[in-house]
Amino acid sequence: MGNSLGCVGLGERLAAAAKDGDAAEAQRLLAANPGLARCTTFGNLNSPLHVAAAKGHHEIAALLLENGADVNARNIYGQTPLMQACRFGHWEVVQTLLVFRCNVWRVENLSGRTALHMAAAGGHVKCVRLLVADAAGDRDGYVNKAANGGVTALHLAALHGHVECVHLLIDERASLAAQTLPCAAPPMASIGAGSTPLHYAACGGEVKCCQILVSRGADRTAINCNGWLPIDAARIWGCNWLEHVLSPKSHLPIPKFPPSGYLSQPLPSLIAIAREQGLNLSSEVSDGFDEGADACAVCLERPCTVAAEGCDHELCVKCAMDLCSVIKSYDSAGIAGEIPCPLCRTGIASFRTTAAPPPPSLAGSPARRSRRNNSGGGGGEHEASNSGGSEKGYGSIDPDAGAVVPLYYAPPFAPSAILT
């Protein structure tokens, strides 16, 4: 309470700046009093970090964290900033919070849901991708963690018909046989205890969700405590078009699904590197790094600090994180989850930190010019790539400067949401 009382005035102005995305005002207030970053508002006890996370302002979130904001702060409902970011699908805020070592296992007071439950319920597959990558040490336990009523993230994604989230969670070893408990909250209580994700998908009415579950081994003969098969749940909820998928006697073929395009092998290694280096979110960093350092070929603003294992192409850690958070993966030599390099399209399974740059006296040497030319070759086909091919929209080689000159780069857009 004392902390809240001290925030009246300046603290409310900081919360307003976090809500409006006014980074200049937030920086001015924090420069005068860094302790404002830890203030909370009256009533719901939201901190400025909660507000910035809910609104998707990742640069302000980073500024608050650098000034001592509690990354795991809870509001009156027990929600953390990570939960707010996942609720509204702000994956760039999720990135920032993970780099500052937020706890992905925290649960909401009333529902017992984690940030993963909220991301899955909202269909925010990029947030799901990041959360699962951070929990790589106990991925099975995290993906299958049940909220109140035994509801898992897969149950919620299936109920709301979020196909990509269902696909990714199954490939991350979410249990197809997880059953709910009698204390599930409405409207899930009406589905009945003992329900599997297939029961929930049947009530949701999305054909592809049911197809993915059945193709991966979900039991169409499972009976819940109401005595319902999944097909019975579909009929009761008015989803009769699912009968050909859910009927245990159906002979119609179920399509086979490849691994999810949102599997991302390099993300765990990148999160670990970003925690050591930071994300360098400032747009002014281009003037501050060594003359001998290469600029990232994607943003042309930050120094290259990570290299892809295999092709050895170098990027800044922020662009590498964005690449692995947004771009879909593909199977390469039977390995799912490799992300295509934006410069040569070689599959990337992990990243490493780059070696120290050569001294400035070597910056213009032929060997260095050759390395810069080689780093731009290969041509790419993804929206976040800036390859060295001659095709318009991806990049070109400047023969005089010997550097990659991007013709087009559209950073991924994170939808804004209104904090209610």
From Swiss-Prot:
Its EC number is 2.3.2.27. Pfam families: Ank, Ank_2, RING_XB3-XBAT31. The keyword Hydrolase does not apply. A zinc finger (RING-type) spans 296-345. It is an enzyme of class 2 (transferase). It comes from the Eukaryota. Residues 355-397 are annotated as: Disordered. SMART domains: ANK. It catalyses: S-ubiquitinyl-[E2 ubiquitin-conjugating enzyme]-L-cysteine + [acceptor protein]-L-lysine = [E2 ubiquitin-conjugating enzyme]-L-cysteine + N(6)-ubiquitinyl-[acceptor protein]-L-lysine. InterPro entries: Ankyrin-SOCS_Box, Ankyrin_rpt, Ankyrin_rpt-contain_sf, RING_XB3-like, Znf_RING, Znf_RING/FYVE/PHD, Znf_RING_CS. GO terms for biological process: protein ubiquitination. ANK repeats lie at residues 44-73, 77-106, 111-140, 149-178, 193-222. GO terms for molecular function: transferase activity; zinc ion binding. Signal peptide: none annotated. Keywords: ANK repeat, Metal-binding, Repeat, Transferase, Ubl conjugation pathway, Zinc, Zinc-finger. The keyword Transport does not apply. Pathway: Protein modification; protein ubiquitination. This is Probable E3 ubiquitin-protein ligase XBOS36. It comes from Oryza sativa subsp. japonica (Rice).
